[in-house]
Amino acid sequence: MNAPAVLPEAQPLSHEGSTRTGVLVLHGFTGNPSSMRGVAEAMVGLGHHVEMPRLPGHGTTVEEMVTTGWADWTGEVRSAHGRLKARVDEIVVVGLSMGGSLTLWSGFELPDVAGLVCINPATTPQAPEVLDMIQEMVDDGTEIAPAIGGDIADPEVQESSYDGAPLRPLLSFMREGLTPMADRYGELALPLLLITSRQDHVVEPANSEHLAATYGGEVEHVWLERSYHVATQDYDRADIERLTGEFVARVTAN
């Protein structure tokens, strides 16, 4: 059986730059690289090497995502990091939503990371009773629930994401991804740029507040007043691209 085709807007990006800095750009749960393309292209414009992978199960069909989980996504992040590391001295990791969670994972697990940029990251799992409810739905045969994507204030912009949320991967994200990290952020000392939308209907801003309050290193916390969850495609997208570029310059030799 042939694998489903990748959506045109979901293609990954790999760019060889002129500096010795790499930027690893990560999208979120049920989304695809299109949500982060503006950030990636801004980093290309600054001359940096860029890798923006398409996470397994994303950018094709929601049915393909059902069989993927945290280990698949971290594996792809590790591979993209390796491709970057082969041609740069240091790397800044930038992620939106679950991509922000993977950014934090990168800070724990990957070498030669100079700084982290988290945009509306998920940092703590849902309450145990919520996870138990999701598990019961899966046990009863429900694989896909209504979508959680598309939270953009700008009416002219539509996010490319699935119209359903696969529940097994969601449980994997919460249990294998967030639960082990949630009380460890104090161990991270890398510079962190944390960008948070005050109005976010997907990931509660309390996730960012928890990260800022418990983080072990320097935190620059910027609040967005005009954008919703997918802020990288929303009213504040140009500010996010500018702030990210300035942060990369500040924490690296470039």
What are these regions (language model features)?
Residues P4-T61:
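Short, surface-exposed "cap/lid" segments of acyl-processing enzymes
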Residues V39, L190, E204-A213:
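Short alpha-helix in the alpha/beta-hydrolase fold that links the catalytic acid
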Residues E51, E209-V230:
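Catalytic histidine neighborhood in serine/cysteine hydrolases
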Residues G95-G99, T103:
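Gly/Ala-rich beta-loop-alpha elbow adjacent to hydrolase catalytic centers
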Residues V117-A127:
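Active-site nucleophile loop of the alpha/beta-hydrolase fold
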Residues P166-R184:
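Active-site nucleophile elbow and catalytic-triad environment of alpha/beta-hydrolase enzymes
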Residues L188, L194-T196, D200:
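Short beta-strand/loop motif that positions the catalytic acidic residue
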Residues R226-N254:
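Catalytic active-site module of serine/aspartate enzymes centered on a nucleophile-bearing elbow/loop
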